[in-house]
C-alpha cells in the first residue's frame, strides 16, 4: 500500500512588517507537507520514502530542513526516520514499525538559513501515524477452564463468560471478536450448551442429569473481523454438582416397638431410608420429623450422620396408666429442596416428604408414688413452738388405688419436725429459729420420701419449703472487733468506732440506738457515746477526761428499731505508745485468748499430764516421812563430807523443786520423800523443769494477788521474842519421838541413830 497520504496540510504563518506610512501588510509563510502515514509491519524495501516537506521561504533564502524528536533522535525507535536531501526535504523510514508498540510519532520539522544557520521559521510538529494491520489473533487468558454447575441449574441462565484480548487497534474490525461453540462432549439431546456470539456467555439449554453425564467438555473459538480473520480456541470442562432430584423413601411402611413405662432411652428404633443422590451431600442427607402423635413431647428423632437413618428416642417417660399405646407419623425429607425437570424445563423447587407409621406399645411397670403437689410452701413465724402442725404430704400410687404408702423424713438438718408415717402430717418437735445456718433467704427445706409396697418398692420425693417470717427475737450485739478496743494515751480524745449487728431482718434491725449504762454513776463523766451520722449500725465512743493507762469496761445498751435492747460491754485499753500509734505491751486479753486457744489448751493439758507423772513418782516406793525439807539440801545432789564413821545404809529422799514463793515457804503442805535416789533420764529432767517453771509461775501469781505497790504488812503478832533455853531444859520423853524422825536427816545422823537405839536390839 502506498504510504503517501492524499491530503495536504497547509500551515500559514505571518510576520510583522516594519513601520511606514503605507498601510501595514502581513507577509505569509507556509509549510507545505504531504501527509505522513506508515503501514504497520511494512515489508520494505528500506529506506523507503515517507513524504516531502517544503517551506516557501526557500524562494528567497537557501534553506536546510531538519527533523528531530521520537523516531529520529529520541526513544523509542531512534534512527527510524531521516531526511536524505536537506534541500529537497524528502523523509525516509528505515525499518518496519509495530503499531502495538508505538502507534504514532510526534516529529518536529525546522527550516534553517544555510548561510547563517539560524532558524527562519517556527517549528512544525507533525504526527506520523502507523496504520494498523490485523496481525494479532484474539487471546484467551487460559487454554483450559474448569467450572462447576449445579444439576438444578435453570436453562437460559449464564453459567460462564469467556473474555479475550486482541492487541490490534481498538474499535476496528481487527479487534472485534466473535465466539463460537465448536463441540460438546458428550452430546445429549436433553442436555446442551450454547454460547453468545458477542458477549461470550455460556448458557445451558435443557436440563442436566448428574447420573447420566456428570462431566461435559466444550471447545470454543474466538475469531476477529480483520482481513484475514485470525482465531484461537479454548477448552471448558463443566462438572455437574449433584442436586436433589431423588426423594428419600422409607424401607417399611409401618414399624412396631414395645417400651416399658417410666424409661428414658436413646435409639429405641432405627428408621433406614433410600436416596438415589450422591452420598454425604445436602441432596442426600435427610431430616426426620414426627408429624403426628407426639403432642406430649415423649419422643424425639434425629438423623445419624453416618448412615443417614432416623434414630427414635424416648426423652420423656411414658405412663401406662395414662396411655397404653402411641401412633406416630414420621416424615423424612432432604436438606436440599427437590427439583424436577420436565421436557427440558426445570420446574419450581418444592419440598417433598415421605412418611411411615410407628406403633409404640407401652408395657406396665411399678410406678413410684406421686406427690400432689410435688413441692409446696408453708409459712410460719420464727420461734414457733413444738407440736404445731405445718401441713401434710399427699402421695398416691399411679398403679393401684389400694397401695399402702409410707412417708419417711429424709432431709431435716435441724431436726425440727416429724412426719407421720401413714398420714404424712408434718409437725414441729422443737422450737424453730430463723437464724439457723440451714435457713436460706428465710426458707427451710424439708424433704420427704413416699415408699409404696410394690415389688420392688419404689420411692417418690416431695418437698416442703418452710417460709419463716421474722420476729424480733434478737437484740443487737457488738461486732467481735468492737468488743476489745485499744487507744494510745496520747490520743485519748480520738473517737473509737463501735459497730453492732442484729440477726433479725427489717424492721427489727437497724438503725440502732446506743446509750451508756450509767448505773455506777461515773461512766458518763468519763465517756461520751454518740451515734454516727448517716449510719444506723455504728456509734463513736469518746473519752471526756484523761485517765491513767489500764483496762476499762464501758457498759452500754444497744436497742433496735423496735426498742429491743441488750446490755453490752466494751473493753477499752489505754496504753503507752512508743511510735504514737501502737501499744508497747500486748493486752492481757490476748493472754486469755491464748490460754483459751487450741494451742494453749494443748500445752496446759501436757503440763497437767507431766505433773501427774511426777505425783505418781513421788508416791511410789517404801514408807515415806512427812517433814519440812530445808532449801539448802540441794537439788538432786548427794552430799558427801568424807566421813570416817560407820558407813551409812543406802537411803535418800525424793528430788523435788523448791517453789520460790512466799506462800510456799509459809505453808505446811507435806512433802513425800523416797528412800531411793533414782537415776534421772532426759524425759524426767524435762518433766522436772516444766513442773518447776509452772510452779514458780503459779506461786508468783498467788503472791501478786495484792497490790505490789504497798509495803510489807504484819499479818500475825505472836508477842515479844524470849531468850533461848538450854537443851537440858527441854523435857520430852523418848517415847514421844517418832522412829521416823531421822529417816531423811542425811548421812550425818545415821551413826548416831545406830548408837542411840543399840540397847533396844535383843542380844
Curated annotation (Swiss-Prot):
Q: Where is the Cadherin domain?
A: 21-140, 141-250, 251-371, 370-478
Annotated InterPro entries: Cadherin, Cadherin-like_dom, Cadherin-like_sf, Cadherin_CS
Q: Does this UniProt record's set of keywords contain Zinc?
A: no
Query: Where on the tree of life does the source sit, at the highest rank?
Result: Eukaryota
Q: Which keywords does the record carry?
A: Calcium, Cell adhesion, Cell membrane, Glycoprotein, Membrane, Metal-binding, Repeat, Signal, Transmembrane, Transmembrane helix
Q: How does it get modified after it is made?
A: N-glycosylated.
This molecule's function is given as:
Cadherins are calcium-dependent cell adhesion proteins. They preferentially interact with themselves in a homophilic manner in connecting cells; cadherins may thus contribute to the sorting of heterogeneous cell types. Ligand for integrins alpha-E/beta-7, ITGAE:ITGAB7, alpha-4/beta-7, ITGA4:ITGAB7 and alpha-4/beta-1, ITGA4:ITGAB1 through which modulates CD4(+) T cells activation.
> What does the record note on quaternary structure?
Homodimer. Component of a cadherin:catenin adhesion complex composed of at least of CDH26, beta-catenin/CTNNB1, alpha-catenin/CTNNA1 and p120 catenin/CTNND1.
Free-text note on domains in this protein's UniProt record: Three calcium ions are usually bound at the interface of each cadherin domain and rigidify the connections, imparting a strong curvature to the full-length ectodomain.
Name of protein: Cadherin-like protein 26
Q: Which organism's genome codes for this protein?
A: Mus musculus
Amino acid at each position: 500500500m502506498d504510504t503517501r497520504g492524499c491530503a495536504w496540510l497547509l500551515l500559514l504563518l505571518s510576520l510583522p512588517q516594519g513601520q511606514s506610512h503605507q498601510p501595514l501588510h502581513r507577509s505569509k509563510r507556509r509549510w507545505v507537507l504531504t501527509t505522513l502515514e506508515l503501514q504497520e509491519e511494512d515489508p520494505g524495501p528500506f529506506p523507503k520514502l515517507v513524504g516531502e516537506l517544503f517551506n516557501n521561504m526557500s524562494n528567497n533564502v537557501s534553506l536546510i530542513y531538519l527533523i528531530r524528536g521520537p523516531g529520529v533522535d529520541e526513544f523509542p525507535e531512534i534512527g527510524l526516520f531521516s531526511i536524505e536531501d536537506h534541500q529537497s526535504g524528502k523523509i525516509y523510514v528505515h525499518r518496519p514499525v509495530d503499531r502495538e508498540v508505538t502507534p504514532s510519532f510526534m516529529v518536529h520539522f525546522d527550516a534553517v538559513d544555510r548561510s547563517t544557520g539560524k532558524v527562519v521559521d517556527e517549528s512544525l510538529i507533525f504526527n506520523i501515524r502507523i496504520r494498523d494491520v490485523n496481525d494479532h489473533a484474539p487471546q484467551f487468558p487460559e487454554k483450559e477452564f474448569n467450572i462447576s454447575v449445579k444439576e438444578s441449574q435453570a436453562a437460559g441462565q449464564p453459567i460462564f463468560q469467556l473474555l479475550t484480548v486482541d492487541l490490534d487497534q481498538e474499535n476496528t474490525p481487527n479487534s472485534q471478536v466473535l465466539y463460537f461453540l465448536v463441540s460438546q462432549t458428550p452430546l445429549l439431546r436433553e442436555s446442551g450448551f450454547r454460547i453468545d456470539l458477542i458477549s461470550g456467555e455460556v448458557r445451558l439449554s435443557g436440563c442436566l442429569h448428574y447420573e447420566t453425564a456428570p462431566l461435559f467438555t466444550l471447545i470454543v473459538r474466538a475469531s476477529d473481523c480483520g482481513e484475514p480473520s485470525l482465531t484461537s480456541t479454548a477448552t471448558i470442562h463443566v462438572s455437574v454438582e449433584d442436586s436433589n432430584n431423588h426423594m428419600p423413601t422409607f424401607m417399611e411402611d409401618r414399624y412396631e416397638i414395645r417400651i416399658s413405662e417410666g424409661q428414658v432411652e436413646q435409639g429405641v428404633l432405627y428408621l433406614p431410608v433410600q436416596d438415589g443422590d450422591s452420598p454425604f451431600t445436602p441432596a442426600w442427607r435427610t431430616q426426620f420429623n414426627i408429624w403426628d402423635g407426639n403432642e406430649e413431647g415423649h419422643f424425639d428423632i434425629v438423623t445419624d450422620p453416618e448412615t443417614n437413618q432416623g434414630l427414635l428416642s424416648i426423652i420423656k417417660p411414658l405412663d401406662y396408666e395414662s396411655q397404653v399405646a402411641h401412633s406416630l407419623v414420621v416424615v423424612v425429607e432432604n436438606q436440599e429442596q427437590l427439583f424436577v425437570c420436565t421436557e427440558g424445563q426445570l420446574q419450581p423447587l418444592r419440598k417433598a416428604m415421605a412418611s411411615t407409621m410407628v406403633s409404640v406399645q407401652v408395657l406396665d411397670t411399678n410406678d413410684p408414688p406421686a406427690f400432689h403437689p410435688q413441692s409446696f410452701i408453708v409459712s410460719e413465724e420464727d420461734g414457733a413452738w413444738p407440736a404445731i402442725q405445718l401441713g401434710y404430704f399427699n402421695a398416691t400410687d399411679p398403679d393401684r388405688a389400694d397401695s399402702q404408702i409410707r412417708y419417711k423424713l429424709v432431709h431435716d438438718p435441724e431436726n425440727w419436725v416429724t412426719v407421720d408415717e401413714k398420714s404424712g402430717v408434718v409437725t414441729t418437735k422443737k422450737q424453730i429459729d430463723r437464724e439457723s445456718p440451714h435457713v436460706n433467704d428465710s426458707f427451710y427445706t424439708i424433704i420427704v420420701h413416699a415408699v409404696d409396697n410394690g415389688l420392688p418398692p419404689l420411692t417418690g420425693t416431695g418437698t416442703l419449703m418452710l417460709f419463716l417470717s421474722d420476729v424480733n427475737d434478737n437484740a443487737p450485739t457488738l461486732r467481735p472487733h468492737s468488743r476489745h478496743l485499744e487507744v494510745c494515751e496520747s490520743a485519748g480524745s480520738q473517737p473509737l468506732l463501735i459497730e453492732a449487728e442484729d440477726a433479725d431482718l427489717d424492721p427489727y434491725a437497724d438503725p440502732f440506738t446506743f446509750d451508756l449504762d450509767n448505773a455506777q454513776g461515773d461512766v458518763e463523766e468519763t465517756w461520751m457515746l454518740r451515734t454516727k451520722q448517716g449510719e444506723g449500725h455504728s456509734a463513736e465512743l469518746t473519752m471526756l477526761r484523761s485517765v491513767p493507762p489500764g483496762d476499762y469496761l464501758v457498759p452500754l445498751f444497744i436497742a433496735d428499731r423496735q426498742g429491743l435492747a441488750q446490755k453490752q460491754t466494751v473493753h477499752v485499753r489505754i496504753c503507752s505508745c512508743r511510735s504514737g500509734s501502737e501499744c508497747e505491751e500486748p493486752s492481757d486479753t490476748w493472754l486469755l485468748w491464748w490460754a483459751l486457744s487450741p494451742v494453749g489448751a494443748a500445752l496446759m493439758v501436757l503440763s497437767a499430764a507431766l505433773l501427774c507423772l511426777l505425783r505418781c513418782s513421788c508416791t511410789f516406793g517404801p514408807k515415806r516421812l512427812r517433814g519440812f525439807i530445808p532449801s539448802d539440801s540441794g537439788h538432786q545432789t548427794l552430799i558427801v563430807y568424807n566421813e570416817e564413821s560407820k558407813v551409812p545404809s543406802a537411803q535418800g529422799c525424793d528430788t523435788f523443786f523448791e517453789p520460790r514463793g512466799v506462800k510456799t515457804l509459809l505453808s505446811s503442805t507435806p512433802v513425800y520423800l523416797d528412800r531411793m535416789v533414782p537415776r534421772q533420764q532426759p524425759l524426767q529432767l524435762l518433766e522436772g523443769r516444766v513442773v518447776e517453771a509452772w510452779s514458780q509461775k503459779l506461786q508468783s501469781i498467788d503472791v501478786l494477788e495484792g497490790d505490789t505497790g504497798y509495803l510489807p504488812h504484819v499479818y500475825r503478832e505472836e508477842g515479844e521474842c524470849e531468850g533461848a533455853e538450854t537443851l537440858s531444859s527441854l523435857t520430852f520423853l523418848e517415847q514421844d519421838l517418832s522412829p521416823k524422825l531421822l529417816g531423811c536427816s542425811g548421812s550425818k545422823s545415821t551413826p548416831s541413830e545406830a548408837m542411840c537405839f543399840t540397847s533396844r536390839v535383843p542380844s
